[in-house]
Amino acid sequence: TNKEVQDQSYNVVMDVVRRYDVDGVHFDDYFYPYGDGNFPDDDTWGEYQKSGGSLSREDWRRDAVNTFIERLYEGIKKEKPHVKFGISPFGIGRPGNPRSILGFDQYAILYADAHLWLKKGWIDYWSPQLYWPVNQIPQSFPVLLGWWSKENTMGRNLWPGMIIGGKTDEKGADEIINEIMIERGFVNDAPGHIHFSMRVFLKDSSALNAGLKAGPYQHQSLVPPSPWLDDVPPDPPRMSATVANDSTVLVTWSHENAKDVFRYVVYYQYEKNWEYTILNSQDRMAALPYSRTVIERARGRQRGDPAQPKVEYVIRVAVTAVDRVGNESAPAVQTMGRSVIPTLQ
């Protein structure tokens, strides 16, 4: 509620945005502190009343938080439109939303009107801290996720927060993987999620790490696009693919507007199946295995007959460019051994 404090906080964040090539600004737990409510704002509250302010003290505090959130979002977009702003609020909007949910009321106690920020679209991604298990009925992960998804009427990226501390054994890993698969089924286009915290992954958390690598994280993924920021994809790259030593496909590419590219994706097709690899903007070459051996059952064979190995070769290669907000270009495609440039299916 103190304007000088708000200005200083705003200026510090904007200084980082201006001077550094950041992807985004993240606020974790942005609200009044937990405690008994004795926040030391008597002076600014008195000044507000003397100036003719008509809000209750609770609404006045919430309004100060709302004003800062909106101001910061607009400031970031004016300075660098591609820099995302996201918040990770307490996971319960308010008790009773939806009806079965019980627990802490951040609106009344922390003066955080998180629901309003989402409704107004003052964020680019939304990561409510859904730190409760699937079967904890008063704070059920899927029930809360479904409610936030329904309330996301501005179509921002919904990336629920999942706590992984203390969940590194097999039982804990199953809980996290179940939450990920529920999120992928509940939320349109399965945009992703955020884990708290990275320290757990850096330790020897074999059950969790192994389960994620073998399950939901076995494939690379791109950050989802943010079409409200920009929905114009970059131009396709120029590419060439050649077979070297009958074992490797060497793919090279260039881009006329390389400064607009954040990632490249190289797709390659073995007969009917496409594979891909995601590379950084500085990369200009990829070496792909020209062949692979698969085991399949030949047509007409009976059950119990041994499966036969089959060698498949790369028949098409494609390269796309991805910009800072996640827009992917049309592909540049080459059919191996031919000069025809077909459409990527």
Placement of each model-derived feature along the sequence:
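Substrate-binding cleft of secreted/luminal carbohydrate-active enzymes
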Residues: 111-137, 148-229
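Solvent-exposed serine/threonine-rich low-complexity stretches and specific carbohydrate-binding patches
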Residues: 276-289
